[in-house]
């Protein structure tokens, strides 16, 4: 049992043999029935992460470790990767993140050697980007959905509550973030928050564009 409340709430992960998963899940649910425990849909997992400002590997960003085909075949031989967004699907670097780009410098340990250590140290000393939460313009969101019911140009619709909807495997979604027409970052992990009644996403942006209240544009849709 691990205490890992990534969304800012008290939470635990229970790990064990996959064959026991259903029985253990049911036992926990029955034990918590008198305490108000509730079942939540899988989409809530991602919504909580974005609302809590916690980037999620395999969804908010992709792992460069899987570029190593021998590692990939050994660890996850049947891995399915869904690549989407306005960023060129071939541009996988746009879908990776460094510790500095997601605000995880505090968990980096430099008491041992590892691949990429010099690059990590250099970026931590002089970071260029950081993680922010984007609050989407409600009128723009409504225009996207309304295009499905109006003559003229049709825009790529949002999935609710999570875009893109999570399937088996990893998502590698990346949308361009622009400021006055210039590229300043990458947006991913787009969700509808019922709590805030807003569309939100997590974005890694240039430090100059990271101030609270800064207006940027997300280039929505698939590449090409």
Please give the residue ranges for each predicted region:
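Conserved, structured C-terminal
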Residues: 1-224
């Amino acid at each position: 049992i691990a205490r890992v409340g990534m969304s800012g709430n008290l939470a635990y992960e229970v790990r064990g043999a996959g064959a026991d998963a259903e029985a253990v899940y049911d036992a926990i649910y029955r034990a918590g029935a008198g305490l108000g425990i509730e079942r939540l849909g899988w989409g809530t997992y991602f919504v909580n992460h974005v609302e809590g400002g916690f980037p999620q590997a395999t969804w908010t960003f992709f792992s460069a470790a899987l570029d190593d085909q021998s590692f990939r075949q050994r660890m996850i031989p049947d891995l399915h990767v869904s690549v989407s967004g306005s960023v060129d699907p071939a541009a996988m670097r746009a879908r990776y993140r460094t510790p500095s780009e997601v605000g995880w410098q505090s968990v980096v340990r430099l008491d041992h050697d590892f691949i990429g250590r010099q690059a990590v140290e250099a970026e931590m000393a002089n970071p260029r980007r950081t993680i922010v939460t984007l609050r989407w313009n409600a009128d723009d969101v409504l225009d996207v959905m309304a295009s499905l019911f109006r003559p003229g140009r049709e825009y790529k619709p949002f999935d609710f509550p999570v875009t893109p909807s999570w399937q088996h495997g990893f998502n590698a979604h990346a949308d361009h973030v622009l400021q006055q027409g210039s590229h300043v970052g990458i947006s991913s992990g787009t969700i509808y928050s019922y709590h805030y009644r807003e569309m939100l996403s997590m974005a890694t942006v240039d430090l100059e564009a990271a101030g609270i209240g800064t207006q940027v544009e997300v280039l929505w849709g698939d590449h090409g």
